[in-house]
Amino acid sequence: MTAIAVVGSQWGDEGKGKITDFLSKDAAMAVRSNGGNNAGHTIEIGDKTFKMRLIPSGIFAAKKGAVIGNGVVINPEVMFGELDNLEKEGIDISGLKISNRAHVIMPYHILQDTYQEEAKGDKKIGTTKNGIGPCYMDKASRIGIRVCDLLERDTFEEKLRTNLAEKNALFTKVYNKPALKFEDIFEKYLEYGQKMKKYVTDTSVVVNDALDKNEKVLFEGAQGVMLDIDEGTYPYVTSSNTISGGIASGIGMGANRLNTVIGVCKAYTTRVGEGPFPTELLDEVGDRIRETAHEYGTVTGRPRRVGWFDSVALRHAKRVAGINALSLNLLDVFSGFDKIKIATAYELDGKKIDYYPASLKELYRCKPVYEELPAWDEDITNVKTWEDLPENAKKFLNRVSELVGVPLVTVSVGPDREQTIVLKNPWEM
């Protein structure tokens, strides 16, 4: 197969960075198609840990480098900070390609994000306040500033003046906040444009040319299916399409070009921010999972909400994202546990259901129906093959695959690239 998409099948933070790094060593290029620096990913290579929010994970191994597609919203300051850190560690970034159609996060987007969240009080969404939502709002309103605009002084000046007039009216009259100054932004972002110029191109052409040559292309999704603007737990979602269908529009290619869609999940479930979470654990078991797995946000540092594995949510993700392979991470967390639970269905107002409700009110009333499985005592962090896994670990994995209806291709037993058990090579599916 020449085109593999990796998508989060839960609420993000599933460990997509690890599997994309693992797969990218055989890829010609790694491509990111949505989101911005609200989506943190951690890569561990040897004794080095890389925490990134914008640059694709495949920058470390893909033969022709990494691509940032038109569906991504770019904070130039964050991007260049990451690139500088990578260069200091000896990582070759010369193969980076940035879409000329990608939208740029401006200072007023970050402020708007912050002011809106503050104004909502108890009804806040729980955004990372990085300006992602307001940037996508401007994109949909057709007033956004794109990467190509930063390369044209007159175009950028006109758009920035127009947008600042609107944003400053909002800030001063609605939020009672100070106005932003044109001169504090204009030259700084023009300079970003010039610094970015050597990487900027029509990435749709780059990616489609690679696919036409039957080169292996790895598509990296950001966040997770349950945060998709259409298919997730709306309004507690992100501002972009995180399902595999969003990859096509976020790159500029036909949806039929994807061969395999790998859904990445944890052996349990986590969520950051507000919103329904049927299997959430608010007890010492949840605390134990959180501390064992170091479940704190890469971007915010916030403790993640923790719950048991939810096969109802996974089946929803499978259907809407076209997932046909599963990559499960953090199996090692359950070593030493007595038992593990899997939600096989929900109970809603006394009735058993096997679907994921659209209504928030219904979701908040849903109670998980659990199936209990025995855990294992063995340390599995050095296990390399399926055969060497404890029998109870195999039973758990088989049950997950059976309930979701998708075969497992990889199982992770630790953070390092080498701590990955490959059941089937996705490039050969």
Curated annotation (Swiss-Prot):
Highest rank taxon of the organism: Bacteria
Major site of localization recorded for this protein: cytoplasm
Positions bound to Mg(2+): 13, 40
Any single GO BP term: IMP metabolic process
Enzyme class: ligase
Keywords: Cytoplasm, GTP-binding, Ligase, Magnesium, Metal-binding, Nucleotide-binding, Purine biosynthesis
SMART domains membership: Adenylsucc_synt
One Pfam family it belongs to: Adenylsucc_synt
Cellular localisation: Cytoplasm
Residues binding GTP, per UniProt: 12-18, 40-42, 304, 330-332, 412-414
Binding sites annotated in the UniProt record for IMP: 13-16, 38-41, 128, 142, 223, 238, 302
PANTHER family: ADENYLOSUCCINATE SYNTHETASE (PTHR11846:SF0)
Family: Belongs to the adenylosuccinate synthetase family.
Subunit structure and binding partners: Homodimer.
Protein name: Adenylosuccinate synthetase
Organism: Lactobacillus gasseri (strain ATCC 33323 / DSM 20243 / BCRC 14619 / CIP 102991 / JCM 1131 / KCTC 3163 / NCIMB 11718 / NCTC 13722 / AM63)
